[in-house]
């Protein structure tokens, strides 16, 4: 009996009764976490705010189709050259497999969408790059679609507005990719010589050969807040010049501060800004005139 005082008491066993109020898993896509401020918000609320964080103003990346839908007048967009696709000109191994995966992921045939549209009744030719497709790298088809878009704007006396987002030249197409820098820049110059209006809007990220060519050749050069814009990477530049670069180097705000941009515009204000500029430069029949150049 005395020994019972020092024996280890037996653990009681309890039955586990499942609760009807057990927390259910949140379906994927219902909530979105901001990579900048780490706040979590309803995806639908974020979409209503044009994918701009309600807390910190971070601009989430968006696809070409979504951007066109939020900018142009409903039903006004008519796509150009939708069937142009890459044909692997250099026979790069596994290149076409990657292209097919990006087609399925993005729903696009290439990394850029071009077409006719109107913004508040103002006609334009619009081009939007989509980073979901090969990081919107510029290959032969991207360069060709930009060229054709500019030529269409020239032929129809419309402004050309392009949204850039790119990792640079497409390495799988080698020299054919690099020549698109000169090809697109020359097209912009010809259009400018004919009195055409070009507006570029640089979004995150605009780098490499795209930033070094047509992206900065607009009559108006704008950017979204926080966009990374530059040619070479930060570490490469620091190792080359042997200097520590500013914290905000290669951001839209840094470029604006140093006179390389005309303005840094929130996505929430962009449509009104573009509409205002187009009204200044374009005469519409509704306004009692004809398009410039006619």
Curated annotation (Swiss-Prot):
Any one of the GO BP annotations: malonyl-CoA biosynthetic process
Main location: cytoplasm
ZnF bounds (C4-type): 34-56
Pathway(s) per entry: Lipid metabolism; malonyl-CoA biosynthesis; malonyl-CoA from acetyl-CoA: step 1/1
Domain CoA carboxyltransferase N-terminal: 30-294
Chain sites annotated for binding Zn(2+): 34, 37, 53, 56
Record text on cofactor binding: Binds 1 zinc ion per subunit.
Record GO terms (molecular function): acetyl-CoA carboxylase activity; ATP binding; carboxyl- or carbamoyltransferase activity; zinc ion binding
Alphabetically ordered keywords of this record: ATP-binding, Cytoplasm, Fatty acid biosynthesis, Fatty acid metabolism, Lipid biosynthesis, Lipid metabolism, Metal-binding, Nucleotide-binding, Transferase, Zinc, Zinc-finger
UniProt keyword Zinc-finger present: yes
EC number: 2.1.3.15
Catalytic activity: N(6)-carboxybiotinyl-L-lysyl-[protein] + acetyl-CoA = N(6)-biotinyl-L-lysyl-[protein] + malonyl-CoA
Tagged with keyword Zinc: yes
Pfam family, one: Carboxyl_trans
Assembly: Acetyl-CoA carboxylase is a heterohexamer composed of biotin carboxyl carrier protein (AccB), biotin carboxylase (AccC) and two subunits each of ACCase subunit alpha (AccA) and ACCase subunit beta (AccD).
UniProt-listed NCBIfam families: accD
Family: Belongs to the AccD/PCCB family.
Protein name: Acetyl-coenzyme A carboxylase carboxyl transferase subunit beta
Natural source organism: Listeria innocua serovar 6a (strain ATCC BAA-680 / CLIP 11262)
């Amino acid at each position: 009996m005395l020994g019972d005082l020092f024996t280890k008491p037996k653990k009681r066993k309890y039955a586990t009764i499942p609760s009807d109020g057990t927390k259910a898993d949140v379906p994927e896509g219902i909530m979105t976490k901001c990579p900048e401020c780490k706040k979590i918000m309803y995806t639908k609320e974020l979409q209503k705010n044009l994918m701009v964080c309600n807390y910190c103003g971070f601009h989430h990346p968006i696809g070409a189709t979504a951007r066109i839908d939020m900018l142009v007048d409903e039903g006004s967009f008519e796509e150009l050259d939708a069937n142009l696709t890459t044909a692997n000109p250099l026979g790069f191994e596994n290149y076409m497999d990657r292209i097919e995966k990006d087609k399925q992921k993005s729903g696009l045939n290439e990394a850029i969408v071009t077409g006719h549209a109107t913004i508040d009744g103002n006609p334009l030719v619009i081009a939007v790059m989509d980073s979901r497709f090969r990081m919107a790298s510029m290959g032969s088809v991207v360069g060709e679609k930009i060229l054709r878009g500019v030529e269409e704007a020239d032929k129809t006396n419309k402004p050309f507005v392009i949204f850039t987002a790119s990792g640079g030249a497409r390495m799988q197409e080698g020299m054919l990719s690099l020549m698109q820098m000169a090809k697109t820049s020359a097209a912009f110059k010809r259009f400018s010589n004919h009195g055409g209006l070009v507006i570029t809007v640089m979004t995150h990220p605009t780098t490499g050969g795209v930033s070094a060519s047509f992206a900065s050749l607009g009559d108006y050069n704008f950017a979204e807040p926080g966009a990374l814009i530059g040619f070479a990477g930060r570490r490469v530049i620091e190792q080359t010049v042997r200097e520590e670069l500013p914290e905000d180097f290669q951001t839209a705000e840094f470029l604006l501060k140093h006179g390389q941009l005309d303005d840094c515009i929130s996505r929430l204000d962009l449509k009104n800004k573009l509409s205002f500029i187009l009204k200044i430069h374009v005469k519409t029949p509704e306004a009692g005139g004809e398009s410039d150049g006619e």
